Amino acid sequence: MKKVVVGLSGGVDSAVSALLLKKAGYEVEAVFMRNWDSQLNFDFQGNPTLNDVCPQELDYKDALKVSLQLGIKLHRVNFIEEYWQKVFLYFINAFKNNLTPNPDILCNNEIKFKAFINYATSKLKPQYIAMGHYARLIYDKNQKVSLACPLDKNKDQTYFLSQLKTSQLKNILFPLADLTKKEVRKIALENGLINACKKDSTGICFIGERNFFQFLNNYLPAQKGSIKRLDGTFLTYHKGVIHYTIGQRKNLGLGNFSSGQEPFFVVGKNLKTNTLYVEPNSQHPHLYSDRALIIDVTWRGEKTKTQIQAKMRYRQPNQKVTLNWLDANTLEILYPQKIKAVTPGQICAFYDDDICLGAGVIKEVYFQNQKRLYT
């Protein structure tokens, strides 16, 4: 009997993954990860659960109940230090440099598919590691692995896994690859799992829901600055340019608008002058670009294709792009059709139809060879 270790989060997806693997005849053990401590990490402002039981402890209790239901052993491991050093400091430093990072992707790279796998393989000696992600792995005749989209396109999580190296996908199982979320809930209900109706987790990976402005103030105190039109007209003050992203409409403090008048949208940022630029047009030309520089690229497979698709943010429909490799880990992408709100700091994931080829960090954005003032 082959042994598999499942990352058990307390949620329904990982619970059903463990259930399916046990029914398939595997020897199943589970591991719960604790990666955030509000007291140790000075997470006070913007924390709605500060005076309640820690949400991660509630998740652990759910994971423990599921493991007892399934008759599998549950281990608990603490990656609070690793998460702080490898994920959160990067996240904060990116904001400090006026970028818009995606901590969920870095969390997968450094914690779920690195620290967790290292712990599980060294301590528990399984043949496989399983995760409750909605993703698929495809093997060719030489057993080379590719990351691919799952059956449930609405829950597709390949964007969040896009920067994983090929070595991190070795001996990984995704039991939910051929199931929809509705089917997962149905399986959980039919088998009486205690978390069958539990809401999906939201917010920052392993941290949860926060008042984001207040949360960032724990680590990066806001610096008041000017909100201007592109022509330099002063409108009002903002609470810190790092708190806004390209294309943002809400929380600009520019008042209500009469019927037929568009609200203002963020079309540019300048960290050096601490200035936020806005225009009253959701389709303003300054929101669009036709070229971007991508750095820190992870690529799985050959680099022969130049005409592929890209996703610059989660749930964005795939966009046609042309690749131009500049070196082993840097490329530029061209998209003459123009794309809205391509934002520095975000991850650009690359696809060949349903195969996720890799990803990198958006560094700079251009339109007609002129750099956009987004940072």
UniProtKB/Swiss-Prot annotation:
Its EC number is 2.8.1.13. Disulfide bonds join 107-205. Signal peptide: none annotated. SUPFAM superfamilies: Adenine nucleotide alpha hydrolases-like. Residues 155-157, 313-314 are annotated as: Interaction with tRNA. Residues 102-104 are annotated as: Interaction with target base in tRNA. It catalyses: S-sulfanyl-L-cysteinyl-[protein] + uridine(34) in tRNA + AH2 + ATP = 2-thiouridine(34) in tRNA + L-cysteinyl-[protein] + A + AMP + diphosphate + H(+). The keyword NAD does not apply. One of its GO terms (cellular component) is cytoplasm. One of its GO terms (biological process) is tRNA wobble position uridine thiolation. One of its GO terms (molecular function) is ATP binding. Belongs to the MnmA/TRMU family. Catalyzes the 2-thiolation of uridine at the wobble position (U34) of tRNA, leading to the formation of s(2)U34. This is tRNA-specific 2-thiouridylase MnmA. It comes from Phytoplasma australiense.
